[in-house]
Swiss-Prot record:
It comes from Pseudomonas aeruginosa (strain UCBPP-PA14). The keyword Transmembrane does not apply. Keywords: Hydrolase, Magnesium, Multifunctional enzyme, Nucleotidyltransferase, Repeat, Transferase. InterPro entries: ACT-like_dom_sf, ACT_dom, HD/PDEase_dom, HD_domain, NT_sf, PII_UdlTrfase/GS_AdlTrfase, Polymerase_NTP_transf_dom, UTase/UR. Belongs to the GlnD family. Gene3D superfamilies: Beta Polymerase, domain 2, cca-adding enzyme, domain 2, Nucleotidyltransferases domain 2. This is Bifunctional uridylyltransferase/uridylyl-removing enzyme.
Length: 900
C-alpha cells in the first residue's frame, strides 16, 4: 500500500474539519470528494494506473479507520474490520464496491449490534458503495466450504481495523488443509471460467466487451492468481515466475496488459459516473480520444483503440490457456502410468497431449512449427498441446522469416493443412492463438484484432475470417443439410475443397488498408497461391473469388432477380458452373460468419434464386439469353391452365392481362399470376382496394409473407402504403409495383413482422393488416403519421450521414435512387413521404438492412412516368431525403452523386 499522501488525505486537516462541523457527514463527504478529484486529475495527466488504484484503496482505508474510531467497540474487543475481494487486494477503481467483512470471534453479535449498525449507516450516509457481511470465524468456515465465491473472496483480505489475529484464524480454518484443496479448487475455478466465457460467446471479440468478465479480461488474470494462491500460497505474477509457470517476458506482458485494462476500466467508471465494466459503444470513442488516438485516412481512432484492446485481451487469453494447461499438468497428475506414444522423431503424445521430443526441435527443424498443426489435424484424437510445447512455439516464432515462408517444406505443409479431412478450422485457430498464423502470413497479422466500427460486422476481421472457415467446415456435416441444403450439396462436389478455404482465408485480408479490399485482397491471394506452387487455374479461381466475394450477395439483395438482364449480366461475370459453385458456397459462409442474425430464410432464398437462375443461363449458354416474349408466354400459359381448372373464363383473364404490361409477367410466377387474376376478377367493383395476404410461394422469398394490393392508382399510393405498414409493425423486404394501362396499381410486398418472423397463418393478424391497409388507402387524406419510436441506443451511436445516389437506367426508362442511411424506426415511411412531396412514382424497390444501416434501392419515375431528367429536381430531392433521414442523426450531410 502507498505511503502517506497528504494531498489525498490529511489526517490533521480532517480532524480539524470534524471539530468545526456539527455533523461528521459533511467532513467525510468533503474528504471523499477531494481524493476522488485528485485521483481523477492524476489519471488524466497519465499517472501510473497501478499506483492510482492502490492509492484509492489507501484513501478508503483512511476513511474507514476514521469512521470506525467514532464508535465504541469496547476494550480489547474481538471484532475486526477486514477488506475482502478486490478491495482486499488493495485495488479499487472509482466506483467499485468496497467489500467489507466485519469479523467476530463468536456468533453472538448482540453486544456489537448497535455500533455495527451505526458504522454501516455512516458509510452509506457519506456515499461509500459498500458490500458488507458480518460473520464469526466459524461462520466464515461454514460458508466458505459451501460456496466457491466466498472462499475466493476470503483468500484476498487485509485487516483495516481491529486485531489481525481474527483474520489469521479465519485464514487458517479456511485453508486448503481444511477445505477446497488445490485440485478441487482448480477444477471448480476452471469450470467457473468456462461458464463465464460461454456467457460472452467464448470470444474476446464481442462488440461491447466486458473488461472484467469477457474472455481475456481482468477476471482471467485474477483466476490464474487465485489458482496460484491456493496451490502455492502466493498471489502475484512474479510468484508464478518463481514457481516456473511464467517466464519474465510473459510476466511483464501480463502485467502491462493488466495495467492497460485497468486504465480502460478506470476511464469507464470516470466517464459513466458509476460502476461500469462494459465497453459500450457510447464510451469507446470517448476513451479512444482520452487515450490519444486520432482518426487517420485508413482507420478511425476508435477502431485503432479497439484493435489495441482486442490484441491485449487475445494475449491474455493465450497466456491464460498456457498457465491453466500448466496448472492442469501439475495439479491434476495422471493417476495411471504415463502413456507415451511416438508420432515421429520430433513429436510424441503424452497422455493424449502432443509435445516435442526434445527442447531444440523447432530450432533444429523450423518446419516443425507448421508440422505440429498438420499432425493435430491428421490425429483428431489429440487433446491439445502440452504447456511446455506451447511456450516453445511462442518462443520460436522469430524463426518464421522470409526464408522460412518460401521454403517448399513449409509451403507444402501449410497447403497440406487445408487438404485435411478435418481439423482445418480448429488448427488455424490454434495457429492464430499461438501467434504462428500472423507470423507466417504477415498480411493476416495486420488484421488481428481489427474491428469495423459498426453493427453489421460483429467480429474482428481475423475472427470473422476463421468463423467463415468454421462455417465452410460445418457445411460438410450431414446435419447441416436441412438448414443449408444447396450449399451442403455443392460443397461435397467441389473438385478442390482446399481452394474454398484459401479463398475464405484471404477474402477480407486487405481490410483496413484503404482502397478496395476486394481488389487488394485478390492481389495478395494470387501472390499466396504462386508462392505455394498452386497451378495457374487454381490461382486464378482463388484470386477471382476474393475479388468478387461480395458480388453475389449484392446482386441478390439489391437487384431485381426477375429481370433477365440482371441474371445474364451475373452469368457473364461468373462464366462457368465451377466459379458459380465456389462463389455461392463462399457467399453463404461469409454472410453467416459476418453476423448470425443476417442469415434468414429470406436472404437464403434470394441467393438460391440467383444461383438457380444463373445455372439455367449457363446451361442455356451465354450466347442464348432468355427471350422475354417466350418467358412471358410460358408464365401466361401456366397461369391460364390453373385459372381454367378453377372455373375462370379465359377471355376474362386475357382481357385483364392485356392491361398489365410485360413487366408484370416477368416479375411474378405463374402461380401468383393465377392467384391475383382470380381474386381481381371476383372482386366487387365498388372502389374498395383488394388486399391479399399469404405465405409467399416464390422461391426467393420463402418464409416471408406476400401482400398483394390491387386498387385505383393514386399519386400517394406508395407513401400511404408503406406508412400504414410501418404502423402495423411490418418490415418490408421487397416491393414490386405495377401500374396497369387502366390506371390500377398492382403492388406486391414481401414483408416480415418487425421481429423478423413471417406473419404466418394467424387469422387475427392477417385481418388486422388487411383492414389497416384498406382503411389507409380508402382515406388517403388521413395519411398515417409516422410512428415516433425510441431509437435503440446502439443505433443512435452509429449515426452517419445519409447518402443518396441517383442514376438513370436507360434500358428500363427509370431512375435508380439508392439510399444508404442509419436504420431508424419508420425510415421507409419517411422516404415514401418525400416521394409523395415530389410527385414521384415508385416502380420497384429492394430493401436491405445491414446492422445499423439500410441500403435501399428505388426505381422511380416522375409525374409523366419518365426518368428524372432535371438536375435541379434531383438535387432538391437529394437534399430533402438527406434532411429527413438526418433527423436525430447529428452528422453532417454528404453530397449526392447524380449520373444521367
Amino acid at each position: 500500500m502507498p505511503q502517506v499522501d497528504p494531498e489525498l488525505f490529511d489526517r490533521g486537516q480532517f480532524q480539524a474539519e470534524l471539530a468545526l462541523k456539527s455533523s461528521p457527514i459533511a467532513a467525510f463527504k468533503k474528504a471523499i470528494r477531494q481524493f476522488r478529484e485528485v485521483l481523477d486529475n492524476r489519471f488524466n495527466s497519465g499517472r501510473d494506473i497501478r499506483r492510482l488504484i492502490e492509492d484509492r484503496a489507501w484513501c478508503v482505508d483512511q476513511i474507514l479507520q476514521q469512521a470506525w474510531q467514532r464508535f465504541d467497540w469496547g476494550d480489547d474487543a474481538d471484532i475486526t474490520l477486514v477488506a475482502v475481494g478486490g478491495y482486499g487486494r488493495g485495488e479499487l477503481h472509482p466506483y467499485s464496491d468496497v467489500d467489507l467483512l466485519i469479523l467476530l470471534d463468536s456468533e453472538d453479535q448482540e453486544s456489537f449490534r448497535e455500533p455495527i449498525e451505526g458504522f454501516l449507516t455512516l458509510l452509506w450516509d457519506i456515499g461509500l458503495e459498500v458490500g458488507q457481511s458480518v460473520r464469526s470465524v466459524q461462520q466464515c468456515a461454514e460458508e466458505a466450504r459451501a460456496d466457491l465465491t466466498v472462499i475466493t473472496t476470503l483468500m484476498e483480505c487485509r485487516t483495516i481495523c481491529g486485531p489481525d489475529s481474527l483474520r489469521q484464524r479465519m485464514l487458517q480454518v479456511t485453508g486448503s488443509a481444511h477445505m477446497w484443496p488445490s485440485k478441487e479448487f482448480f477444477l471448480a475455478k476452471r469450470h467457473e471460467q468456462q461458464r463465464r466465457h460461454a456467457k460472452y460467446n467464448d470470444t474476446e471479440y464481442n462488440l461491447e466487451p466486458n473488461v472484467k468478465g469477457s474472455p481475456g479480461g481482468l477476471r482471467d488474470i485474477q483466476t490464474i492468481l487465485w489458482m496460484a494462491r491456493r496451490q502455492f500460497g502466493s498471489l502475484n505474477l512474479h510468484a508464478l515466475v518463481r514457481e516456473g509457470f511464467l517466464v519474465e517476458s510473459e510476466c511483464s506482458m501480463l502485467a502491462s496488459s493488466q495495467e492497460f485494462l485497468w486504465r480502460v476500466r478506470y476511464a469507464l467508471h470516470m466517464l459513466a459516473g458509476r460502476a461500469e465494466d462494459r465497453l459500450l459503444f457510447d464510451h469507446q470513442r470517448s476513451i479512444a480520444r482520452l487515450f490519444g488516438y486520432e482518426d487517420n485516412d485508413v482507420k478511425l481512432a476508435v477502431e485503432r483503440f479497439m484493435q489495441k484492446y482486442y490484441r491485449v485481451v487475445m494475449a491474455i487469453s493465450e497466456l491464460n490457456d498456457l498457465i491453466i494447461q500448466h496448472f492442469e499438468e501439475v495439479i491434476l497428475p495422471c493417476e495411471q502410468p504415463v502413456q507415451i506414444q511416438p508420432l515421429n522423431s520430433r513429436f510424441q503424445l503424452r497422455d493424449g497431449y502432443i509435445e516435442v521430443t526434445h527442447p531444440n526441435v523447432f530450432k533444429r527443424t523450423p518446419f516443425a512449427l507448421l508440422e505440429i498443426f498438420v499432425l493435430m489435424a491428421q490425429h483428431p484424437e489429440i487433446k491439445g498441446v502440452r504447456a511446455d510445447t506451447i511456450r516453445l512455439l511462442r518462443d520460436s516464432r522469430h524463426l518464421i522469416d522470409d526464408e522460412f515462408r518460401h521454403d517448399i517444406r513449409n509451403t507444402s505443409l501449410f497447403i497440406e493443412l487445408f487438404k485435411s479431412s478435418q481439423g482445418i478450422h480448429r488448427n488455424l485457430r490454434r495457429m492464430n492463438r499461438y501467434g504462428i498464423l500472423g507470423r507466417y502470413l504477415p498480411e493476416f497479422g495486420h488484421i488481428i484484432g481489427q474491428m469495423q466500427h459498426d453493427l453489421f460486422h460483429i467480429y474482428t476481421v481475423d475472427a470473422h475470417t476463421l468463423n467463415l472457415i468454421k462455417h465452410l467446415r460445418k457445411l460438410n456435416r450431414p446435419e447441416m443439410a436441412e438448414k443449408y441444403p444447396l450449399a451442403s450439396k455443392i460443397i461435397d462436389r467441389l473438385p478442390k475443397p482446399e481452394l474454398i478455404y484459401i479463398a475464405g482465408l484471404y477474402h477480407d485480408i486487405a481490410k483496413g488498408r484503404g482502397g478496395d479490399h476486394s481488389e487488394l485482397g485478390a492481389v495478395d491471394a494470387e501472390a499466396f497461391c504462386q508462392s505455394h506452387q498452386l497451378p495457374p487455374w487454381d490461382t486464378q479461381l482463388v484470386s477471382w473469388l476474393v475479388q468478387n466475394h461480395l458480388v453475389m450477395s449484392t446482386t441478390a439483395q439489391r437487384k431485381d432477380l426477375s429481370d433477365p438482364q440482371v441474371i445474364f449480366d451475373f452469368a457473364q461475370l461468373v462464366g462457368d458452373q465451377t466459379h458459380l459453385d465456389y462463389l455461392y458456397v463462399l457467399t453463404v459462409a461469409d454472410i453467416n460468419a459476418t453476423n448470425p442474425t443476417l442469415w434468414n430464410s429470406w436472404r437464403a432464398s434470394l441467393l438460391r434464386q440467383l444461383y438457380t437462375e444463373t445455372k439455367r443461363a449457363l446451361r442455356r449458354g451465354l450466347e442464348n439469353p432468355v427471350d422475354r416474349e417466350e418467358q412471358i408466354r410460358q408464365t401466361q400459359t401456366a397461369a391460364l391452365d390453373q385459372l381454367v381448372r378453377n372455373g375462370i373464363d379465359q377471355d376474362d383473364a386475357e382481357q385483364l392481362w392485356s392491361q398489365l404490361g410485360d413487366d408484370y409477367f416477368l416479375r411474378h410466377t405463374a402461380g401468383d399470376v393465377a392467384w391475383h387474376t382470380e381474386a381481381i376478377l371476383q372482386h366487387p367493383d365498388d372502389g374498395t382496394p383488394l388486399v391479399l395476404i399469404k405465405e409467399t410461394t416464390q422461391r426467393e422469398f420463402e418464409s416471408g409473407s406476400q401482400i398483394f394490393i390491387y386498387a385505383a392508382d393514386q399519386h400517394d399510393f406508395f407513401a400511404v402504403t408503406v406508412a400504414a405498414m410501418d404502423q402495423l409493425n411490418l418490415s418490408i423486404q421487397d416491393a414490386r409495383i405495377i401500374t396497369s394501362t387502366s390506371q390500377f396499381t398492382l403492388d406486391t410486398y414481401i414483408v416480415l413482422d418487425a421481429d423478423g418472423d413471417s406473419i404466418g397463418n394467424n387469422p387475427e393478424r392477417i385481418a388486422e393488416i388487411r383492414e389497416g391497409l384498406i382503411d389507409a388507402l380508402k382515406n388517403p387524406d388521413d395519411y398515417p403519421t409516422i410512428i415516433q419510436r425510441r431509437v435503440p441506443r446502439q443505433l443512435k451511436h452509429f449515426a452517419f450521414a445519409p447518402q443518396v445516389t441517383i442514376s438513370t437506367d436507360a434500358l428500363r426508362q427509370v431512375s435508380v435512387l439508392e439510399v444508404i442511411a442509419p436504420d431508424r424506426p419508420g425510415l421507409l415511411a419517411r422516404i415514401g413521404g418525400i416521394f409523395l412531396d415530389f410527385d414521384l412514382s415508385v416502380q420497384n424497390a429492394k430493401i436491405a438492412t445491414l446492422g445499423e444501416r439500410v441500403e435501399d434501392v428505388f426505381y422511380i419515375t416522375d409525374a409523366r412516368n419518365q426518368p428524372l431528367a432535371d438536375p435541379d429536381l434531383c438535387k432538391r430531392l437529394q437534399a430533402a431525403l438527406v434532411e429527413q433521414l438526418s433527423q436525430d442523426n447529428g452528422r453532417d450531410t454528404l453530397p449526392t452523386r447524380i449520373n444521367f
